[in-house]
Regions:
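Non-heme di-metal
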Residues: 3-217
């Protein structure tokens, strides 16, 4: 599945069925969605920030890992575009949370405890989910899971900073491989050329009005 850039309909359906039936993945979704759709607007913003800044990243680790080794390059380009979009979402929802908290300073301690508790819960679920997701993907499974979790802790700190809190996992985040961090750069491994037809940069088109003479073939 990871060695091909396109999957058959049967493989896609099997992956969907696996996701629906995976307990860790479903608990992971429930942990966030119960607050995302809850009645507390500030907790909703915390959930939205963690959804955009933390929960997406474990599944992107292996394609980035492969791209650092010259495989799945175009897939990594697409992932960088997705992550760029999600970075804006995470920053904005975190910004809105901080502005909302300024209007309710009496809730600062409550929401700080809520946020850190939710992040800890999600990190435990990420470890279980990543074990299910990547189990058997590579011969050195433990090294792979360790790399995933370092990457997840790195993004957990980014999520906390979006919410206005100090990073809590610097020791774990520091174990993220430098090549993975480099692969996140927007201009990393650009492949804008005739043959690939892809890349992780936005190319702005230029319009030119046609003249009558243009249609004289």
């Amino acid at each position: 599945m990871y060695k091909r850039q396109m999957c058959s309909s049967e493989e896609i359906n099997a992956a969907y069925t696996w996701a629906i039936g995976n307990p860790a993945l479903q608990r992971r979704a429930t942990a966030v969605m119960q607050h995302y759709y809850g009645d507390d607007p500030l907790k909703r913003k915390v959930a939205a920030t963690l959804l955009s800044s933390l929960l997406l990243y474990a599944g992107f680790y292996l394609p980035l890992w492969f791209s650092c080794r010259g495989t799945l390059m175009n897939t990594a380009d697409m992932i960088r575009l997705i992550l760029r979009d999600k970075a804006v979402h995470g920053y904005y929802s975190g910004y809105k949370f901080q502005r909302g908290l300024e209007a309710h300073p009496e809730r600062s301690a409550e929401l700080e405890e809520f946020t850190f508790t939710l992040v800890e819960e999600l990190l435990e679920l990420e470890k279980e989910y990543s074990g299910d997701l990547y189990g058997g993907a590579l011969a050195d499974e433990k090294s792979l899971i360790d790399g995933v979790m370092a990457f997840v802790h790195y993004n957990a700190d980014k999520a906390l900073m979006n919410l206005g809190y100090p990073p809590q996992y610097e020791e774990e985040a520091a174990k993220t491989e430098p090549e993975i961090i480099a692969a996140l750069a927007p201009d990393s491994n650009e492949t804008h050329d005739f043959f690939s037809g892809s890349g992780s940069s936005y190319v702005i088109g230029r319009a030119e009005s046609t003249e009558e003479d243009d249609w004289d073939f």
